[in-house]
Amino acid sequence: MQLNFAKYQAAGNDFIIIDNFQDQHYTYSPVLTKQLCHRQFGIGADGIISIEKKAGYDFALLHYNADGSQGRGLCGNGSRSALHYAQVLGIIDQKAYFNAIDGAHIGCIHNELVDLTLQDVNSIQPLASGYFLNNGTRHYVEMVDSIDLIHMEVVGFPKRNMYPFEKEGININFAQLIAPDAIQIRTCECGLDAEPLSCGTGAVASALVASSYYGLNSPVKVSTKGGKLQVTFTRLPDGRFIDIHLVGPVYQSFYGIVHPASLLPIVAYNPL
């Protein structure tokens, strides 16, 4: 069996995009997913996005994490990358109505710039030293003064299983105000063993927290290690957020063909 794929990145958040809409059929396997995403023993990526057929939609997206697990929430940058690839494949033109794990979304493509709508956010709740919200994915956001001083391995990753998310986990974001209309963020995600260069839904979550508690108005510019994103929204008097959009460029790195049977098992480094 051979598997055709496209490699994409959006603000450095990289994905293997698989066309399950047309001829081939990728069957989810935790072991194979982990192998494909491994940066030494596979193609290398933060995750896999599969484009699927679904009645009533232009297409549906399935998301798998680099650790082999299935995504439990919306993947913002992965969805934007898949939107671009769906246009390349001729599945859509410039606009799409598609389904993800959290429900229906609309995406618009203007060359490399891809605009993704997200679900309304009805509340942002204080939690520990930060705030919790769900924008299709659970996020914890903590505002800090010096984001570059954060040691993710020590401070960030352990918080992914903080109370009350010990079992299912939660994505952790640190955000710093850098201008009256801009923030800088870093994220550690469930399903990833290393800090990604960006996280789309994390950018949105951080922008909404900055708006709700620090007065930033739409649009909010978000800087990440991998590039810049923009978040637009309407903030209602009761604190709810509607008409939420994540906007930014996506880039196709390359096409490829992989023969899964030829992949070597992932082995742990064993120094002599």
Residue ranges of predicted features:
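A glycine-rich beta-to-alpha transition motif near the start of alpha/beta enzyme domains, typified by
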Residues: 1-111, 133, 141-272
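Active-site glycine-rich loop that binds ribose-phosphate moieties when present
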Residues: 116-129, 150-159
